[in-house]
Amino acid sequence: MGKFAELTDCELATMKCVWDAKDNITVPEIVEKLKENYGLDYKPTTVYTFVKKLYDKGFVDYFKRGVKFYYPKRTQAEYIQSELNRTCEFWFDGSKTELVSALLKGESMSTEERKDIQQLIDSLDE
């Protein structure tokens, strides 16, 4: 899997709106979703700049049917995996054990979450 370009927080929120869209999405729709989902109130020209940067970085593409409709070129799962790998390499010297340990020590977990995690661990042996 190739390394993805890093995204700024604004680009990432914009990309999340594209990933979450059930269909292709326009800049005005992204503006609305950014406000609804993240409380980010950007002008359409600002969001267009974010989308242009995402296009330049290879995250989105578009087609034009009166207006530009954007769609993801990279999946959310690919990006998450890339970010987790990058975090693991940089902060934990490649140790997945240290990464998981840091994640689990950070917050308290419900009994349900503990059971789910144990099932995931048990399934690794299968």
Predicted regions and their residues:
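A short, conserved structural fragment
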Residues: Y55-R65
